[in-house]
Amino acid sequence: MRKLSFLVLLFLFFLNACAKEKKEASIIKASNQDLEIVAAYTEAYKALSQGDPYFAAKKFLEAELLFPQSEWAPRSALLASYSYYMQNYYTEALNNLERFLITYPNSKNLVYAHYLIAMCYYETIEGEKKDSAPIYKAKAKFNYISKNFPNTDFALDSEFKLDLIDDILAAKEMYIGRHYIKKGKWIAAINRFKTVASEYDQTVFIEEALHR
C-alpha cells in the first residue's frame, strides 16, 4: 500500500508535464535523439506499469543519458530511482537518489527525491529488536521534508510516518527496559522508561512507561 500511494502521487505530478511535452513533440519535428528519448521513456513507463521495474529503471537511465540537459533527464533519473525502489533494490535507489541531489540541485522535484530516500530507509525498518540505523535515518529525512516542504502531500505523509517511527522507537526503549529488569539492572531500566515518558509521550507506550 505504501508503495502504491507514492506511485499515485508521483504519476499525478508528472502527468501534466509529460502530456505537455508530448504535445509539443507532435508539433515540432523531432530529431533522431528526440525520438530515441521518447521511445526509451515510453518503454520505461510501459515496463513499470506491467510490473517490470528493473527493466524500467534501465530504460529511464537510458533516457537520462540521451538528453542530459533537458527536463527529461531529472525526471528520468527520479523515476529510475523509484523503479529500483519498487523492486526493493533500496541500495541502488539510494545511490541514484544521492546522485540526483548532486546532479540536479535546482530541480523542482527535490521533494520527491528526499521523500523516496526516506521511504527507502523506512521500508528497511525491522522493528524494535533490530538495527536502529534505518529508523533514525528515515526519521531525519522525514523531519527534513516536514520542515522544508510544508503544505505538501509529502510533508503530510512524512508527519504521519514520524508518528509511526516514534511508536517503533518507544517500543525499542520499552523492550530494552524490560530486558534490563530481567537482568536486575533497575536504574538502567528506569532510564529507558523515562526516555519514553519524556520523548515519546504521545505513543501507546506512555502508560506502561509511567507505570514502570
Give the location of each predicted region:
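Sec-dependent bacterial lipoprotein signal peptides
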Residues: M1-C18
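Acidic, polar-rich low-complexity tracts and alpha-helical solenoid repeat scaffolds
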Residues: F14-R212
